């Protein structure tokens, strides 16, 4: 029967002797290649194409020998005689012992950790061999004339000594090496995605932390000594070799990469070999705790090797250049101190000007207030509105920011009985405005120019005002504005404009003498303003005046009035005044 045939065939094959016979799941199915990981000849049965293959698990008193990725490829091929080659012939003794002692889990194979005893023995053999080599023969230093061909010679003792750690690391079994190389990388990536472990009780966490710190410190010191010695030896030998060959750039880069690889490989083996010793101290470390420590130690050793190689290749001229650079910088700073003095002086003067400007303005305002108080005491017949409005208007202009937006225009008017008071008061108010500068205000009299040509008067007025303002005078008095030729008054567009005035930091005081004998004190400021406007309109415009750009017309007069009528104040007569003498 089919069951007997399979039983007989199982007797002939390797570990099939230990398999307990079992009836097939389905009859009439052909036999296929093993599907249990590629390491056994357990019979399996064909499955329909639409379904995935199912593995059959058989248990016995002694589990069969199962190998995963490390099964030799020769075992899968049939021998010429027709029998399958026994797997034990291709395995080392150590591997056979590991397999016999391991548990058989076909569906979920866990990653095996190397036993602490074997790892300690392997570390002892390597340490003993290194000590014997150092005791028998001191480390040879490669001579400067050694060539690359001599280094590559397999019979030279220098190469054997330089690559001793690499040969020792190769004696480890293939399975152990692969687990060492794969563990840090895979655990590194997975650990970052895992949650941190639960907290331990305080007394347990304290004891565990002390043990781990003590063991980690010991391992780090030993790893520093071993890997630093190997990295320094390799870098020195190869840097001397590259000096003779002539290709410094290409070979130094290759040496740099190889030294990186050797230091990292030796660090991996050393750290993994010492893992069981730490585990045997009473606390088993999880992979989450081992991976950060391994990466941290490996990074430290790579940095040490890089630093030493850079120090070895650095020329003395570079270091001396760094030392001598400090005095040069010091002398450079001392020499540049003299250039800082003019800069400091400029900053000091600028700050002095910035902070002194408000003081100057404050002093100018105070001086103007003192002068106005004196005038108020002299001209006691004037209305209180005259003093209050004029002083406030001019103080505001003095306190305004620099540059000022527009000039200050003040228009004073009076009747025939107050002609002398109008003349004296207008001049003294203008002088009070410029009293801080200790200069007199510009004086222009319209009665002297009444019979002159309009264009000539315009030119003369322009020259007097512009020259005076350019020479430091900041105030001007224009007497008898109504006596100017009508066309000549258009020049005041230039000096009285709200936005485009030629000089904005100045004050102009204009006077208009009305034809009335007296000006009542009961009139308001609005009524006085309208009276002056009507009077100027009669004086400057008539039906016989031609319409031209240099002749006055109602439109031009309206524009001029809007520029000179900022503040219109009446002046009353003073009985104490004598003719031609001001108070």
UniProtKB/Swiss-Prot annotation:
It is a single-pass membrane protein. Its main location: nucleus. Residues 216-225 have a biased composition (Acidic residues). The modification Phosphoserine is found at residues 60, 135, 143, 154, 156-157, 186, 215, 227, 230, 242, 305, 309, 315. It is found in: Nucleus inner membrane. It comes from the Eukaryota. Expressed in muscle, liver and kidney. Residues 1-254, 271-293, 309-328 are annotated as: Disordered. One of its GO terms (molecular function) is lamin binding. One of its GO terms (cellular component) is nucleus. GO terms for biological process: nuclear membrane organization; positive regulation of ATP-dependent activity; protein localization to nuclear envelope; protein localization to nucleus. Glycans are attached at residue 399. Residues 356-583 are perinuclear space. Residues 356-583 are annotated as: Interaction with TOR1A. Residues 359-435 form a coiled coil. The modification Methionine sulfoxide is found at residues 146, 301, 552. Interacts with ATP1B4. Interacts with TOR1A (ATP-bound). Interacts with TOR1B, TOR2A and TOR3A. Interacts with VIM. Required for nuclear membrane integrity. Induces TOR1A and TOR1B ATPase activity and is required for their location on the nuclear membrane. Binds to A- and B-type lamins. Possible role in membrane attachment and assembly of the nuclear lamina. This is Torsin-1A-interacting protein 1. It comes from Homo sapiens.
């Amino acid at each position: 029967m089919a069951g007997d045939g399979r039983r007989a065939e199982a007797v002939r094959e390797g570990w099939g002797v230990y398999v307990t016979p079992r009836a097939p799941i389905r009859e009439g199915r052909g036999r296929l290649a093993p599907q249990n990981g590629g390491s056994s000849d357990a019979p399996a049965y064909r499955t329909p194409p639409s379904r995935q293959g199912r593995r059959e698990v058989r248990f016995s008193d002694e589990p069969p020998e199962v190998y995963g990725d490390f099964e030799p490829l020769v075992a899968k091929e049939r021998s010429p005689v027709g029998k399958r080659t026994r797997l034990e012939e291709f395995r080392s003794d150590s591997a056979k012992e590991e397999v016999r002692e391991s548990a058989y889990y076909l569906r979920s194979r866990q990653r095996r950790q190397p036993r602490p005893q074997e790892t300690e023995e392997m570390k002892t053999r390597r340490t003993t061999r290194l000590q014997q080599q150092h005791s028998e023969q001191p480390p040879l230093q490669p001579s400067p004339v050694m060539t690359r061909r001599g280094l590559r010679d397999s019979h030279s003792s220098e190469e054997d000594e330089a690559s001793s750690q690499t040969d020792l690391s190769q004696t480890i079994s293939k399975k152990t090496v692969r687990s060492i190389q794969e563990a840090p990388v895979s655990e590194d990536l997975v650990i970052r995605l895992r949650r941190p472990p639960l907290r331990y009780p305080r007394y347990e966490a304290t004891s565990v932390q002390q043990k781990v710190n003590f063991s980690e410190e010991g391992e780090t010191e030993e790893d520093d000594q071993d890997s630093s010695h190997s990295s320094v030896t390799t870098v020195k030998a190869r840097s001397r070799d590259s000096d003779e060959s002539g290709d410094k750039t290409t070979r130094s880069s290759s040496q740099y990469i190889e030294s990186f690889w050797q230091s990292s490989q030796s660090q991996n083996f050393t750290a993994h070999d010492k893992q069981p010793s730490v585990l045997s101290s009473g606390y088993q470390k999880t992979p989450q705790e081992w991976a950060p420590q391994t990466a941290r130690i490996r990074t430290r050793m790579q940095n040490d090797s890089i630093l030493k190689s850079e120090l070895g290749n650095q020329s003395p001229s570079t270091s001396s250049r760094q030392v001598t650079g400090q005095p040069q910088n010091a002398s450079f700073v001392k020499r540049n101190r003299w250039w800082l003095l003019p800069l400091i002086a400029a900053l000091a003067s600028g700050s002095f000007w910035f902070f002194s400007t408000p003081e100057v303005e404050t002093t100018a305002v105070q001086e103007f207030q003192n002068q106005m108080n004196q005038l108020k005491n002299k001209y006691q017949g004037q209305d209180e509105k005259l003093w209050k409005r004029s002083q406030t208007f001019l103080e505001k202009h003095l306190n305004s920011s620099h540059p000022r937006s527009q000039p200050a225009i003040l228009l004073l008017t009076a009747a025939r009985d107050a002609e002398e008071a109008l003349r004296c008061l207008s001049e003294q108010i203008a002088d009070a405005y410029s009293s801080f500068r200790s200069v007199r205000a510009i004086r222009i009299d319209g009665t002297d120019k009444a019979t002159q040509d309009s264009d000539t008067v315009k030119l003369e007025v322009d020259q007097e005002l512009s020259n005076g303002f350019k020479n430091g005078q900041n105030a001007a008095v224009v007497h008898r504005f109504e006596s100017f030729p009508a066309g000549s008054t258009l020049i005041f567009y230039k000096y009285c404009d709200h936005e485009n005035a030629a000089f904005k930091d100045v004050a102009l005081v204009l006077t208009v003498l009305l034809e009335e004998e007296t000006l009542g004190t009961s009139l308001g400021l609005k009524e006085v303003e309208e009276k002056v406007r009507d009077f100027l309109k009669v004086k400057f415009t008539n039906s016989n005046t031609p319409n031209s750009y240099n002749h006055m017309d109602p439109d031009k007069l309206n524009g001029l009035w809007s520029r000179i009528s900022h503040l219109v104040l009446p002046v009353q007569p003073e009985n104490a005044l004598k003719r031609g003498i001001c108070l």
